[in-house]
């Protein structure tokens, strides 16, 4: 909870992330554009890099604890684990994106600056601090080697990752629309697995999303942790949820 609390409780979220990275001894750069700033931690830069991202900005009027100090905390824990390794050879950019809540501006600027031809795939960590289930929108990427083992079936099974076929849009969609394979990961309560799976099935079979589906979606507890909802407060969140996702990503990057 420490990282999540420092980010969610700060009036300078970007500055808090920079302070944490500096304290752990990570090398990072701040991408400064006219309309957004990103923070990038690069390991072994190449033209076949995997991007693991989380947006650092918050919805106006929200403290942005679950959306998305939790995802930023996941990235910080994984970076910390990699720094503790004597050797890490995979090419990975950990990117803290700005202005996701304004249409994924930070993700768009990052792709423009790096070049989509130099990005192999993208993992988006968004809303990772509530519930006891890991949900991953795989977008037909199970077993895709571009994800450096993170999408291996054995790893997904080991960490009990659920594949509902649908999660709400985030920065992953900016990469997907650019032709870059992408997945999104979050945590949620058990009922969310059912609701997201039902919506995912309808999308994949070209069935309409009904008003009843929308009501079921908006009634989920995890949805209420976002955008000024009933549970949009860090007191409702769990460090254990963040750890689940961080452990899955760390295991995939270091041990697969």
Where are these regions (language model features)?
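N-terminal capping segment at the start of a domain
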Residues: 1-12, 18, 57, 219-235
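A non-catalytic alpha/beta surface segment that caps or lines the substrate-entry region
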Residues: 1-44
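Short secondary-structure junctions
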Residues: 23-31, 155-164
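Structural recognition of the beta-strand scaffold that forms the well-ordered cores
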Residues: 40-42, 51-53, 93-96, 120-125, ...
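Glycine/charged-rich beta-loop-alpha catalytic/anionic-binding loops adjacent to active sites
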Residues: 47-48, 53-61
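Acidic/histidine-rich catalytic neighborhood of metal-dependent amide-processing enzymes
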Residues: 59-150, 158-168, 172-174
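Glycine-rich beta-alpha junction loops
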Residues: 126-129, 188-192
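His/Asp/Glu-rich mid-to-C-terminal helical/loop segments that flank catalytic regions of hydrolases
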Residues: 194-256
């Amino acid at each position: 909870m420490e990282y999540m609390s420092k980010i969610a409780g700060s009036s300078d979220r970007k500055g808090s992330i920079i302070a944490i990275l500096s304290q752990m001894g990570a090398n990072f750069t701040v991408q400064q554009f006219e309309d957004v700033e990103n923070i990038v931690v690069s390991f072994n830069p190449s033209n076949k890099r995997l991007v693991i991202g989380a947006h650092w900005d918050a919805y106006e009027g929200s403290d942005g604890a679950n959306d998305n100090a939790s995802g930023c905390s996941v990235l910080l824990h994984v970076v910390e684990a990699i720094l503790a390794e004597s050797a890490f050879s995979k090419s990975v950019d950990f990117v803290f994106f700005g202005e996701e809540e304004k249409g994924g501006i930070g993700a768009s600027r990052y792709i423009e600056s790096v070049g989509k031809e130099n990005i192999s795939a993208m993992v988006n960590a968004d809303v990772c601090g509530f519930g006891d289930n890991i949900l991953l929108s795989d977008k037909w990427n199970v077993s895709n080697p571009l994800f450096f083992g993170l999408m291996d079936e054995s790893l997904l099974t080991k960490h009990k990752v659920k594949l509902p076929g649908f999660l709400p849009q985030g920065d992953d969609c900016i990469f997907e629309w650019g032709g870059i394979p992408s997945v999104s990961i979050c945590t949620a309560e058990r009922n969310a697995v059912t609701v997201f799976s039902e919506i995912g099935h309808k999308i994949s079979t070209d069935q309409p999303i009904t008003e009843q589906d929308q009501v079921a979606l908006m009634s989920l507890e995890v949805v209420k942790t976002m955008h000024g909802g009933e549970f949009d407060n860090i007191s409702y969140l769990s460090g254990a949820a963040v750890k689940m996702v961080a452990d899955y990503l760390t295991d995939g990057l270091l041990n697969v």
